[in-house]
Amino acid sequence: MSTGAQTKAAAASQHADGPRLLADVGGTNARFALETGPGEITQIRVYPGAEYPTLTDAIRKYLKDAKIGRVNHAAIAIANPVDGDQVRMTNHNWSFSIEATRRALGFDTLLVVNDFTALAMALPGLTDAQRVQIGGGTRRQNSVIGLMGPGTGLGVSGLIPADDRWIALGSEGGHATFAPMDEREDLVLQYARRKYPHVSFERVCAGPGMEIIYRALAARDKKRIAANVDTADIVERAHAGDALALEAVECFCAILGTFAGNLAVTLGALGGIYIGGGVVPKLGELFMRSPFRARFEAKGRFEAYLANIPTYLITAEYPAFLGVSAILAEQLSNRTGGASSAVFERIRQMRDALTPAERRVADLALNHPRSIINDPIVNIARKADVSQPTVIRFCRSLGCQGLSDFKLKLATGLTGTIPMSHSQVHLGDTATDFGAKVLDNTVSAILQLREHLNFEHVEQAIDILNNARRIEFYGLGNSNIVAQDAHYKFFRFGIPTIAYGDLYMQAASAALLGKGDVIVAVSKSGRAPELLRVLDVAMQAGAKVIAITSSNTPLAKRATVALETDHIEMRESQLSMISRILHLVMIDILAVGVAIRRAAPNAELAEAMARAKARAGASAGDEAADVLDWLSHGAAPAAKD
């Protein structure tokens, strides 16, 4: 940790995009720090969580106390599982949206990770001075590492080596069911069951668990204990030699050893087991003399296996900051130089070839990408201190058609910060909040469709449509909107098409179809029995069915080709929103595919196109090229003379 003194070398190594906010948020306290450069962590402050209504309030208080200007990037390690955008703390009353918090604080980047995932990322960099070995064993290089730590809860994580980097495991292993190893622990379990229907290891070997053990032993000895006795009091009494407190600490450490052994054999942690958290360091010599290590190795046939695995107590000050700093640095590195963010790599490569004015726009895009995405051109020009035409020239220098095209590519490069899980809209959300959630949910669904769509099925569907004699689009209810949109696009290809949203008309028309005809059935549920019966009639007559629906539905299983668009809607009872967008996107993909096939006709279609040209006075290929240009909003390449 830096002392805060600035040397010339330190100044030279400062982050170009300004100081980064680091946070370690536990169930009791929130710790904050600023990282001014790699390894330069300063202004560490601790705030009691109970004094602030929200996490945002605590961060604002810290930024005010630290007297820091704008912070662009922040990362938070939190004592809670992190799955998606919404975080609701288990051991505290804070609940927040990551994206809403980022917007409220004006950050370009806000990462939130499990605190033990962050702590795990700090382990490879710990020196011998920052850890103390307990017992024997020798760690094996480039092997799995386990991490655990009792604090307000019982954190668990692990590190897996992968080439030249480490992958941290997010885990809630502390909630595994507690299994007693002796009669004393049986007594503790029975006592804890009076209060908790499920007794996890966290209940008995996190900080509050020591109080449960102490009271269970007191009840055994028929001793009365004051209601206000807590873990800190028990540890203090143990250090003073109190027999009951000493036994409680001994039992606590033994249970912790059992859990550590479980973690070691589960992960195959030949790189060692590390102990963090705030409780064990306060035990001092009591822990060193405890049965922790003996219980760790007590695994019967696997005793020799565990005897070779070392266990360490982390003694580094604020180690979670080191880990969360590494995670944030990797995220920002991927953005500016990783293969997954080509637009940022392109800006970096082109920067030296740009004019000085264009470089200022490039720097704004690299350091404040969301400002480029969200602001109108007048604000972008003002922030970069350039003219509006310079902004456009910069975009075109990167090969973009204009600012809108550049914004789209930039947003794609930022997908790592777009929540890839569903965010619920709640009563009381502002227009900013629920509007952002609707947009984020839609973007997330489209990105996931891109990752999971079966493009072999897409190719098959395009082949079927391109060779169809007639195409009919069926959609009931809200899906009829998609069917009508598809009809509007496909009829321009010169293929007879029609859309039906009425079940009676669908049944009447399907009875007339046969070989060479195609039905595109659009359905969110894929379970309407009437629609399935209509499709059966058409397929028995030789027609083919392309289904745009969810996976593993009766419609998907029955269709000739299924294009599956799985997603999450906010509520099943309301009109489909995300599914409609995904279905429209699928229609666009199919239409573009057919347009490409028809704009570059093969020899077998030449005669048919010649006849079409004679009748219509224009080439069918030219017509398809026009449709392709229309579908791509003018972005399709111009045909050569």
From Swiss-Prot:
Q: Where are the transmembrane segments?
A: 576-596
Q: Which keywords accompany this UniProt record?
A: ATP-binding, DNA-binding, Glycolysis, Kinase, Membrane, Multifunctional enzyme, Nucleotide-binding, Transcription, Transcription regulation, Transferase, Transmembrane, Transmembrane helix
- Its EC top class is transferase
Q: Where is the HTH rpiR-type domain?
A: 341-417
Q: Does the keyword Transcription regulation apply?
A: yes
**SUPFAM superfamilies in UniProt:** Actin-like ATPase domain (SSF53067), Homeodomain-like (SSF46689), SIS domain (SSF53697)
Chain spans, region Putative HTH-type transcriptional regulator: 341-641
Q: Which GO terms describe its molecular function?
A: ATP binding; D-glucose binding; DNA binding; DNA-binding transcription factor activity; glucokinase activity
Look up the EC number in the record and give it: 2.7.1.2
Q: Name one GO cellular component term.
A: membrane
Check the record and name the InterPro entries matching this protein: ATPase_NBD, Bacterial_glucokinase, Glucokinase, Homeodomain-like_sf, HTH_RpiR, RpiR-like_SIS, SIS_dom, SIS_dom_sf
Q: Which residues bind ATP?
A: A23, D24, V25, G26, G27, T28
Superkingdom, taxonomy of origin: Bacteria
PANTHER family annotated for this entry?
GLUCOKINASE
Q: What is this protein called?
A: Bifunctional protein glk
Organism for this UniProt entry: Burkholderia mallei (strain ATCC 23344)
